[in-house]
């Protein structure tokens, strides 16, 4: 092991450490960071060399953060990235600095977004927050209005997690939805992601995603938002149901096939006569 460490350059060590951090399961960033810190044994190298990994993890995971002075959380996503460590809270129309290692928001300041699309963004946000409140007890959503390639675009992100370290499992739901505001009809594109880690007496992870496409009738802001939420609700319900049914099927078939139906002797043990068996006698005499 020592020989291997001597062969690795600092750059290679940081690259390996960064991969561990980026792939940390939901709710386990600190544990992975602390383990990597011990392995690398160079705090300055880790902080400077793996800073991009801290940021990438939070962006990928839709990390929720609370801004002091504001009631609701906002998600850290690529769509709200203003550069130089600053992010956008489109609901409260403020920018803020975000510490990717401490996961803290500071220095909130007024920020004027794209006013031309604000009425659409607000309508979708209102409908989306009602939907998230109903379906995700711990859910957070952030809705952006941006001009992308000359097209006014609405982007809605949802995050919901359950961290149960005492029960040896953590899980996170993420979904991202987009559509452009075009006359008559438009295309809705979504991606749904589930990641769960169970680690009591083992190490099992569920990592799943599904891409969605559907058409949306565009009318006024409020009605379009309602129709958009119908698409979101139907797709997310179908996905969650399919995941549950698939696991039930695996439990009834695949996992049963992995279990031996009979001992190697092909005969069942008569537990009422266990003492007559050699092992029973040995246990009795012990």
From Swiss-Prot:
It comes from Monodelphis domestica. Belongs to the F-actin-capping protein alpha subunit family. The modification Phosphoserine is found at residue 9. One of its GO terms (cellular component) is cortical cytoskeleton. F-actin-capping proteins bind in a Ca(2+)-independent manner to the fast growing ends of actin filaments (barbed end) thereby blocking the exchange of subunits at these ends. Unlike other capping proteins (such as gelsolin and severin), these proteins do not sever actin filaments. The modification N-acetylalanine is found at residue 2. One of its GO terms (biological process) is actin cytoskeleton organization. Transmembrane segments: none annotated. Keywords: Acetylation, Actin capping, Actin-binding, Phosphoprotein. GO terms for molecular function: actin filament binding. SUPFAM superfamilies: Subunits of heterodimeric actin filament capping protein Capz (SSF90096). This is F-actin-capping protein subunit alpha-2. InterPro entries: CapZ_alpha, CapZ_alpha/beta, CapZ_alpha/beta_2, CapZ_alpha_1, F-actin_cap_asu_CS. Component of the F-actin capping complex, composed of a heterodimer of an alpha and a beta subunit. Component of the WASH complex, composed of F-actin-capping protein subunit alpha (CAPZA1, CAPZA2 or CAPZA3), F-actin-capping protein subunit beta (CAPZB), WASHC1, WASHC2, WASHC3, WASHC4 and WASHC5. Interacts with RCSD1/CAPZIP. Directly interacts with CRACD; this interaction decreases binding to actin.
């Amino acid at each position: 092991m020592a020989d291997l460490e001597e062969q690795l350059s600092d750059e290679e060590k940081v690259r390996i450490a960064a991969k561990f951090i980026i792939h940390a399961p939901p709710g386990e960033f600190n544990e992975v960071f602390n383990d990597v810190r011990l392995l690398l044994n160079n705090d300055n190298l880790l902080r400077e060399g793996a800073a991009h990994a801290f940021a990438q993890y939070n962006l990928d995971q839709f990390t929720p953060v609370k801004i002091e002075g504001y009631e609701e959380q906002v998600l850290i996503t690529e769509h709200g990235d203003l550069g130089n460590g600053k992010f956008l809270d489109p609901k409260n129309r403020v920018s803020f600095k975000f510490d990717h290692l401490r996961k803290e928001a500071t220095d909130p300041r007024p920020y004027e977004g794209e006013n031309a699309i604000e009425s659409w963004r607000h309508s979708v946000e209102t409908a989306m927050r009602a939907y998230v409140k109903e379906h995700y007890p711990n859910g957070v959503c952030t809705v952006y209005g941006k001009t992308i390639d000359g097209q006014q675009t609405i982007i809605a992100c949802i995050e919901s997690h359950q961290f149960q370290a005492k029960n040896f499992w953590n899980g996170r739901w993420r979904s991202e939805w987009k559509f452009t505001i075009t006359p008559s009809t438009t295309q809705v594109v979504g991606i749904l992601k589930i990641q769960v880690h169970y680690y009591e007496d083992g190490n099992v992870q569920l990592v799943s995603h599904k891409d969605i496409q559907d058409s949306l009738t565009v009318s006024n802001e409020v009605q379009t938002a309602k129709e958009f939420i119908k698409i979101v609700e139907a797709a997310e319900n179908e996905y969650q149901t399919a995941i549950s049914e698939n696991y039930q099927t695996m439990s009834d078939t695949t996992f049963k096939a992995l279990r031996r139906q009979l001992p190697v002797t092909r005969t069942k043990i008569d537990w009422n006569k266990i003492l007559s068996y050699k092992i029973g006698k040995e246990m009795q005499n012990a």
